[in-house]
Regions:
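Divalent metal-coordination and catalytic microenvironments
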Residues: 8, 41, 46, 61, ...
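Extended active-site neighborhood of metal-dependent phosphoesterases/phosphodiesterases
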Residues: 56-148, 215-218, 234
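Short, flexible/disordered intra-domain loops and linkers
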Residues: 14-22, 54, 84-98, 167-179
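Binuclear metal-dependent phosphoesterase catalytic core
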Residues: 208-281
Length: 281
């Protein structure tokens, strides 16, 4: 079983406001992504930069994903589904908060009205979710019920890392604490109580990282395919575990160097063991 993990595309129509040339770069990624031969592609959020306030950008992201002709499961990030009224007030264009049920948000209308999605792949389950601060959509109890209903190994797909990926942080908003602090803590507690959750696949921080979440679960981030560090993950799953590898995309190889030019390439692209290895379950 092969799973392709991409994240943080940050799609916006050309000519792009944030990163000129981004869509051309993403289009150069199309053929390499198809050649992976994935049974499923997971997309761990921030499909857009301005989608929370400009739903037509979400439609463009869906068009791009559909055009790959690879089965996929996508979840929203903070730029697709504003995480809280506070974030919406701080960033009304990039993280607009929609005080409506999930299914009536721009993301829900574009990608599906259910914030929890399941794909059954033989002896493996893939569960994706979109979450907002204080869980107005009731995602956490749904997840608990879904995870408890089956004993097969689970790859859980969300947007926000639940434990730090780099220390020290290059910026106060590096990580999830500024976005979903209470809900993130509750989600981490939930995962630690569910021994069948073997991998938590996420994005958000634009780095390639691997961190333990619990004795039974590992957190893996993919870089930002669109804005950098432009990487994607390939997971080969068998009955005893998962082998992970990392490939470079066509976009920039770094993102946080604009904040701190002294950051190493390893900060963005990960160590050797973060880029490839095996997880046993």
């Amino acid at each position: 079983m092969r799973i392709l993990h991409i994240s943080d595309l940050h799609v916006e129509p050309a000519p792009e406001e944030r990163l000129p040339g981004l869509m051309a770069s993403l289009d150069r990624d199309r053929d390499p992504l198809r050649r992976v031969g994935a049974d499923l592609m997971i997309v761990s959020g921030d499909l857009t930069t301005y989608g929370s306030s400009r739903p037509e950008h979400l439609a463009l992201a869906r068009e791009w994903l559909d055009g790959l002709d690879v089965p996929y499961l996508a979840v929203p990030g903070n730029h697709d589904l504003g995480p809280s009224p506070d974030r919406g007030a701080r960033s009304p264009v990039q993280e607009a908060y929609e005080d409506v049920p999930y299914g009536r948000t721009g993301y829900g209308r574009t990608f599906g009205t259910d914030p929890v999605e399941v794909r059954d792949l033989g002896q493996l389950r893939v569960v994706g979710f979109g979450v907002r601060e204080d869980d107005p959509d009731g995602v956490l109890p749904r997840l608990a019920e879904t995870l408890a209903a089956d004993t097969r190994p689970v790859i859980l797909v969300g947007h926000y890392p639940l434990v730090p990926t780099r220390d020290p942080k290059p910026h106060e908003e590096f990580g999830s604490e500024a976005f979903v602090p209470r809900t993130g803590a509750a989600l981490l507690d939930l995962i630690r109580r569910q021994p069948n959750v073997r991998l938590y696949a996420c994005g958000h921080v634009h780095v390639t990282s691997v961190r333990p979440l619990a004795p039974h679960c590992t957190q893996v981030t993919a870089g930002s395919l669109g804005q950098g560090a432009s990487t994607y993950r390939v997971y080969d799953v068998d009955s005893s575990g998962l082998t992970y590898a990392t490939a470079l995309g066509a976009g920039p190889l770094g993102f946080w160097h604009t904040v701190d030019p002294n950051l190493s390439g390893e900060f963005s692209l990960g160590t050797g063991t973060e880029r490839s290895g095996r997880l046993i379950w």
